[in-house]
Swiss-Prot record:
It comes from Listeria innocua serovar 6a (strain ATCC BAA-680 / CLIP 11262). Binds 1 Mg(2+) ion per subunit. Residues 252-457 are annotated as: N-acetyltransferase. SUPFAM superfamilies: Nucleotide-diphospho-sugar transferases, Trimeric LpxA-like enzymes. The gene is glmU. Catalyzes the last two sequential reactions in the de novo biosynthetic pathway for UDP-N-acetylglucosamine (UDP-GlcNAc). The C-terminal domain catalyzes the transfer of acetyl group from acetyl coenzyme A to glucosamine-1-phosphate (GlcN-1-P) to produce N-acetylglucosamine-1-phosphate (GlcNAc-1-P), which is converted into UDP-GlcNAc by the transfer of uridine 5-monophosphate (from uridine 5-triphosphate), a reaction catalyzed by the N-terminal domain. This is Bifunctional protein GlmU. The lineage of its organism: Bacteria, Bacillati, Bacillota, Bacilli, Bacillales.
Length: 457
């Protein structure tokens, strides 16, 4: 098999996005759109990927580190000029080169593989990826002769009335014989209104040289959708989300209302898990089998075990074991580690907290910078007081401890195994194993005093 190369065009300014963020770095379902493109290419057994960068080059290189080589296009002088910048990496090499736009996040590896195969079968010097749409306004048209052979690409503004009625369009993705590509690029002129060097002119140069130029027609226009503004970004995200959600459903996940469920592309979900409407699953979240995530929940870059029930809660960068109950209205902040058979009830917040197996935090609790053992019960209103205004300190609670309601554990503090903290206590010293910790003022009842307070009739 001949060598395969790919050039990804990612140097455009994206002025229509009206954004400080470099255009191709705008995310589509949790991943920058240029990374979608490069990740699809990387599955094609390509020998080298070269990404043409311009504005914001450093940020693009950070996202694609290890996935691509990079060449800078200092001046944006057109698509042919952009590809020519890869001359130092690819010129003179035998093989075929894919040219793909970095703002087409929906293009799939299977389509590019089919394009490569068709190019090889036709023994072409260039093959254009085309598609048919109902309204081709604004797109370059594919002009074929009576035998269906490609003659040229005509831009919409240059097309005759007859040519404008053609519905087959140029998607902007190509496959070239590598040597023929770079030889032709040297002859592309900028003799046009914009004064730019256009890649479709390479097709004309090759045709004039009597080389074979083919066109592979794909079925779906969606894959060729280019993102140039926020409206197109929203459309691409919608289409990508549908693709992601349908893939999960095919793999045994129930999405009660897929049109109202947001799932990033790198999320993994086990079989027989049920995701209700209004759920957002972001980042590299992994959810096991037989879980239920109810409406209003958000889970970000977290690992969730099996048979976990998350009710209307938020989980960020945390780990949850098996058979755990979370919520409603719980908030697991980063670095929470919840072990098996734990209950995290309503209005409970954890942060950098390890919660041991079988422990219950039923309601209205804050545990930050805490290490909690097995089979602990923490009563309503209890707090691990971890911050003194300058420094954070740790609370350690042993196994089989009972913490009564409305207790304050002033860190740093350690509560030993099987200890009992009396309700309403403010614990400032370590509590030994098997001890009762009680720290509150003695109650004093002043008989008859309430009559002088006028608090009731």
């Amino acid at each position: 098999m001949s060598k395969r190369y790919a050039v990804v065009l990612a140097a455009g300014q994206g002025t229509r996005m009206k954004s400080k963020l470099y255009k191709v770095l705008h995310p589509v379902c949790g991943k920058p759109m240029v990374e979608h493109v490069v990740d699809q290419i990387s599955t094609l057994d390509v020998d080298k990927v070269v990404t043409i960068v311009g504005h914001g080059a450093e940020k693009v290189q950070e996202h694609l580190a290890g996935k691509s080589e990079f060449v800078k296009q200092d001046e944006q002088l057109g698509t042919a000029h952009a590809v020519l910048q890869a001359k130092s990496e690819l010129a003179g090499k035998d093989g075929v080169t894919l040219v793909v736009c970095g703002d087409t996040p929906l293009i799939e590896a299977s389509t590019m593989e089919a394009l490569l195969k068709y190019h090889h079968e036709k023994r072409a010097k260039a093959t254009i990826l085309t598609t048919v749409i109902e309204d081709p306004t604004g797109y370059g048209r594919i002009i074929r002769d009576d035998l269906g052979i490609v003659e040229k690409i005509v831009e919409h503004k240059d097309a005759t009335e007859k040519e404008q009625r053609i519905s087959e369009i140029n998607t902007g993705t190509y496959c070239f014989d590598n040597k023929a590509l770079f030889e032709a690029l040297e002859n592309v002129s900028n003799d046009n209104v914009q004064g730019e060097y256009y890649l479709p002119d390479v097709i004309k140069i090759l045709k004039d040289a009597d080389e074979v130029v083919a066109a592979y027609k794909m079925e779906s226009f969606e894959e060729s959708l280019g993102v140039n503004d926020r409206i197109a970004l929203a459309e691409a995200s919608k289409l990508m989300q549908r693709r992601i959600n349908e893939n999960h459903m095919r793999n045994g996940v129930t999405l009660v209302n897929p049109e109202n469920t947001y799932i990033d592309i790198d999320v993994k979900i086990g079989q027989d898990t049920v995701i209700e409407p209004g759920v957002m699953l972001r980042g590299k979240t992994v959810i096991g089998d037989d879980c239920v995530v109810t409406s209003g929940s958000e889970i970000v870059s977290s690992v969730i075990g099996e048979r976990v029930h998350v009710r209307n809660s938020s989980i960020f960068e945390s780990k949850v074991g098996d058979d755990v109950q979370i919520g409603p209205y719980a908030h697991l902040r980063p670095e929470s580690d919840i072990h098996n058979h734990v209950k995290i009830g309503n209005y409970v917040e954890t942060k950098k907290a390890v919660v041991g197996e079988g422990t219950k935090l039923p309601h209205f609790i804050y545990m930050g910078d805490a290490e909690i053992g097995k089979n602990v019960n923490v009563g309503c209103g209890s707090i691990a007081v971890n911050y003194d205004g300058k420094n954070k300190a740790k609370t350690i609670i042993g196994d089989n401890v009972f913490v009564g309601c409305n207790s304050n554990l002033i860190a740093p503090v350690k509560v030993g195994d099987r200890a009992f903290i009396a309700a309403g206590s403010t614990i400032t010293k370590d509590v030994p194993e098997d001890a009762l910790g009680i720290a509150r003022a003695k109650q004093d009842n002043k008989l008859g005093y309430a009559k002088h307070l006028n608090h009731g009739k």
